[in-house]
């Protein structure tokens, strides 16, 4: 098992601060994976879209160039009820994150930690970290954050909401408070996991009245389509035009992603999607209740589709047992900035997968 772990660490190092995919584990380590609890998506929504995709004739979508970005933005705008002039469609939310953060390279940035590492990987200069801690369940003190940003003369503030990996949230009212007290600060709100919280808490449409606000959304998580690479940003048209003129983004979305955008707007699909979403959210409640019975591990409440667990010991042994003994792939968090090396993240999956994860963790829990 030690040899396998060393090979995994090598593979992990090649992936930077992100996790190797299941494909990489299977192909490079020849590891059987029965449960991918690292992957963050709604499996029921994935199954739903696949059923629609199988009925489509995809030949032309593969053969010909897809429409350009602004055309796809108009298709998306009808589905999400956002003015297309304020939209950029990205090759995954990650493309939007990278391009937007590059526009702020010379700015004084505040990153709330622990959080998604790409925000501080792209540009390591001029970053001021605002740390949350486990004693406060990683909840954000908005008043202290505002004071911090004012004192440090912050020009760009990044808020991942719900946050990854902690699953904590900042309410819409608190976000508006931040906007009010930091009127000259560019604020990036990453809502990649908002669909697992409450879509009414989204600040997408606040962009209309706040030119300094940028909202980033992923379609991969909630719809289970990570392989299609599809996300978007809502921002002031001047910002999007600046990015278009600098980076192009002419054909950055593929034909299969176009099919999804077209399918997304179908009334029947929307009806079935809501049922898939409700089923998944109900399963998350059950999974959290299961995890909360672990006596020697602390499970943190989450408003996303994952949970972080403090195992109270170096996480390597726990991770290795799950992966190499139980064929369960989880997210080891010992590389997360300002997070102790005792934390593990598990994703909510199907009922069957959740039960496998819980049963394996119970075995570990008894040994702690």
Task: Identify the function of each model-found stretch.
Residues 1-64, 78, 152-153:
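N-terminal "arm"/small-domain region of PLP-dependent enzymes with the aminotransferase-like
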Residues 46, 68, 212-293, 297-300:
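PLP-dependent aminotransferase class I/II
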Residues 95, 102-159:
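PLP-dependent aminotransferase-like
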Residues 280-281, 294-326:
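Conserved PLP-binding catalytic core of the aspartate aminotransferase-like
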């Amino acid at each position: 098992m030690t040899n396998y772990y060393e090979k995994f660490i090598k593979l992990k190092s090649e992936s930077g601060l992100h996790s190797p995919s299941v494909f990489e584990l299977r192909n490079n380590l020849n590891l059987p994976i029965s449960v991918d609890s690292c992957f963050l998506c709604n499996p029921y929504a994935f199954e739903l879209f696949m059923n629609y995709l199988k009925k489509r004739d995809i030949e032309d979508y593969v053969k010909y160039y897809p429409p350009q970005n602004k055309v796809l933005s108009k298709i998306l705008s009808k589905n999400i009820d956002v003015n297309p002039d304020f939209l950029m469609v990205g090759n995954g939310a990650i493309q939007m994150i990278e391009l937007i953060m590059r526009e702020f390279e010379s700015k004084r940035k505040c990153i709330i930690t622990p959080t998604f590492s790409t925000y501080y990987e792209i540009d390591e200069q001029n970053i001021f970290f605002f740390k949350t801690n486990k004693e406060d369940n990683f909840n954000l003190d908005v008043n202290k954050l505002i004071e911090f940003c004012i004192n440090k003369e912050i020009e760009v503030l990044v808020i991942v909401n719900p946050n990854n990996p902690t699953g904590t949230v900042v309410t819409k009212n608190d976000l508006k408070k931040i906007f009010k007290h930091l009127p000259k600060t560019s604020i990036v709100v990453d809502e990649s996991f908002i669909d697992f919280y409450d879509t009414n808490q989204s600040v997408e449409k606040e962009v209309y009245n706040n030119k300094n606000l940028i909202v980033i959304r992923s379609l991969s998580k909630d719809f289970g389509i990570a392989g299609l690479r599809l996300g978007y940003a809502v921002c002031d048209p001047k910002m999007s035009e600046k990015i278009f003129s600098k980076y192009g983004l002419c054909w950055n979305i593929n034909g299969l992603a176009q099919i999804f955008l077209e399918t997304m707007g179908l009334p029947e699909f929307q009806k079935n999607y809501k049922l898939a979403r409700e089923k998944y959210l109900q399963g998350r409640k059950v999974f959290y209740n299961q995890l909360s019975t672990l006596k020697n591990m602390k499970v943190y409440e989450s408003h996303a589709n994952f949970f972080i667990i403090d195992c109270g010991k170096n996480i390597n042994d726990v991770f290795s047992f799950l992966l190499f003994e139980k064929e369960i792939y989880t997210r080891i968090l010992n590389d997360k900035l300002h997070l102790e090396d005792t934390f593990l993240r598990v994703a909510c999956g199907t009922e069957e997968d959740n039960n496998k994860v819980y049963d394996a963790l119970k075995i570990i829990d008894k040994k702690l």
